Amino acid sequence: RTLIIILFLWADTKLFSSEHSVNYSFTQLSIEQGLSQATVQSILLDHKGTLWIGTQNGLNSYTQEGIKTYLHHSDDPHSLPSNYINHLTEDSLGNLWIATPKGLALYDAEQDRFNTTISQAIYSSIKVKGGIWFGSENTIYCYDYHSKKTKIIHIKKQEKKKNINMVDYRIQKMVYLDKNKILVGTRRKGIYSYNCQTQQFSLFIPSSPNLLTSLYITLDQHIYTSFYGSGLYCYDQTGKIQEHYTQTNSGLNNNYILDITEHNGKLWLSTDGSGINQFAPHTQQFSQLQHIVGDYSSLPVNSITLLYKDQEKNLWAGSVRGGIFCIKETYIKTYKDAVLNNPNGLSEKSIISLYEEKNGKVWIGTDGGGINLYDPSTDKFTHFPSTYGDKVISIAEISESELMVSLYTKGIFLFNKKTQQYRPFTIIDKETNYKECFYGYLPLANQVANNKIYIISRNAYAYNTHNHTFSKMQTDRHYDFSNNALCLSYSN
């Protein structure tokens, strides 16, 4: 009987990632792409699709046309009040507000300029019915859309005999507890509840010795807070503490949490130096996304200042020195080259050949980096320095201990997995081997059965790995080679 076999020189490869594992891709914008500064304080995607990025040195707008930077100019009253951007928000009317330590600016899109409306430092905001509120130091500025006027609310009233440290009452966060109550988080004086009907403040969560860094209410109405260096707190709707997660009593890898958001059923926690923690409340389990040196698919940086989910449900992260990046789920993970013997990448990023063992491990032939071994169970690579410099154009398994590899311009060798050394392999005899390996052809080894390897070069042979015999195969010369394929006719 006649068996027709097509051997493609380039074939589809199986993904290394396991079927159910989720990886993440990161699209980064930083100084190299035109950002004015790499420390990001605030991110906003407006209703027109423009991405606004507030840094410690300027405001940036990002569109399909590129990045445009806005700065403070002392001789221009319509420039930004300050280059240090604390906060960005868009109100219900589509107006863009920019909060800085030296005032609040409203962006005039038609004139492409700014009008400063409040000269005091602004740190936070919240949309309310008929307007928008801005948090300052012990003060909330309440802007009304209809009247275009602003009224002021104070958390604590100044007493004649007692001075208030206004900085301690800096309003870091404002979120809705319910339709009539707003939680107002201060820098050092705790979290207050503001009743919109009675217009009264009451202390909701007592103060902490450390600075408030984040305040977030989940869809199931749990309240989460973070104080710098104190881990993660969870409260119920009455302000009663439910849980306190730290490095010592949970899987949290860093107590310095800078921001909190909810995404795809998990809490995402940005940390100061340890990447992003993902927390699953239903299992009480933490997992991490971190930057790993040499792993180009890992988180770009480990110090994350903020997390922002836009109206398209894209998740963005701002960082201390790496600009911003968009985080998206993907079932494809990209592996690039790393320094020799770094297990997080390849010895050479150009891959010529692949062979998967029964145990799932993948042998990789590179273009000049020799042989690599990938273990999916650990997601790590092993480099073999003894093969470094070799261009490995095909790999097949000749036994449990040896691989048959074809090396560009060198011929076919057997590679011992334990000793990590080559030994020569001869196709039939020295004369035949020379013609097949050094007459301008590249011998390719392809395993088609447990005991059978096809060796394709000037001619084609079936090699039996058990009795070490060769059978010459007939080539179908009428086959169309336009698809880079070799067609063989072989009779058993």
Give the location of each predicted region.
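Carboxylate-rich, polar loop motifs that coordinate divalent cations or form catalytic acidic clusters
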Residues: 1-492
